[in-house]
Amino acid sequence: MLNFYNTKITVAGADEAGRGCLAGPVTAAAVILPIEFKNAVLNDSKTLNLKNRNFLKSLIEDEAITYGVAHVFMKEIDEINILNASILAMHRALQVLKFDPDHIIVDGNRFKPYQKIPHECIIKGDGKYMSIAAASILAKTYRDEFMEKIHEEFPDYNWKKNKGYPTKEHRAAIKKYGVTKYHRKSFKLLPDQLKIDF
């Protein structure tokens, strides 16, 4: 894990979570870490267990120079598509920062310019740069918390466990109970995604 993209300028890392889900928002975070920040556990959120993610969430919130988290909800996802919604969520997370960075590094290969600030897309960046890894952790933990909250309203879909991803269990629940207000209507839920092969 590289500490910093460039120590001579202020760099924000950005990442999103929930892009491949059938339900819930897409959530993004942007993080600017201090140059002296170090943590051996920090890595891509997908590789960490729940305990480590929650520990790092608190650590990042305490030690980041500034961070922002933003959701784009189902209606907007359906209107502008999931790729644009993911980029919009990252833009909104950047807007929440206390100040603009000199440069933005983004996990993945697609991004639209934000306020004329130079940016670079880095494939698997959440496993390469600490600020992107930190953003991936905040995006995932904030989104997971939201999904656990709405699980109480619709427990049949078990969002507490699947977080809205298209698991067999989730697809079976959609087939049995239909879609909710939290489902993304732009995803083709019928018939292919409802085929369940046990």
From Swiss-Prot:
Q: Which Gene3D superfamilies match?
A: Ribonuclease H-like superfamily/Ribonuclease H (3.30.420.10)
Q: Which cofactor does it need?
A: Mn(2+); Mg(2+)
Q: Where in the cell is it found?
A: Cytoplasm
List the catalytic activities from the record: Endonucleolytic cleavage to 5'-phosphomonoester
EC number(s) in its UniProt entry?
3.1.26.4
> Where in the sequence is the signal peptide annotated?
none
Sorted alphabetically, which PROSITE patterns does this protein's record hold? Answer: RNASE_H_2
From its record, what is one biological process in GO terms?
Answer: mismatch repair
Q: Name one GO cellular component term.
A: cytoplasm
Q: Which organism is it from?
A: Christiangramia forsetii (strain DSM 17595 / CGMCC 1.15422 / KT0803)
One Pfam family from the UniProt entry? Answer: RNase_HII
Instruction: Show the PANTHER family listed in the entry.
Output: RIBONUCLEASE H2 SUBUNIT A (PTHR10954), RIBONUCLEASE HII (PTHR10954:SF18)
InterPro entries recorded = RNase_HII (IPR022898), RNase_HII/HIII (IPR001352), RNase_HII/HIII_dom (IPR024567), RNaseH-like_sf (IPR012337), RNaseH_sf (IPR036397)
Which residues are involved in binding a divalent metal cation? Answer: D15, E16, D107
Which EC main class describes this enzyme? Answer: hydrolase
Task: State the protein's purpose.
Answer: Endonuclease that specifically degrades the RNA of RNA-DNA hybrids.
| Domain RNase H type-2 per the UniProt entry, residue ranges | 9-198
Chief subcellular site? cytoplasm
The UniProt note on the cofactor reads as follows: Manganese or magnesium. Binds 1 divalent metal ion per monomer in the absence of substrate. May bind a second metal ion after substrate binding.
Protein name as it appears in the record: Ribonuclease HII
Q: Which Gene Ontology molecular function entries are recorded, alphabetically? A: manganese ion binding; RNA binding; RNA-DNA hybrid ribonuclease activity
From the broadest rank down, the organism's phylogenetic lineage runs: Bacteria, Pseudomonadati, Bacteroidota, Flavobacteriia, Flavobacteriales
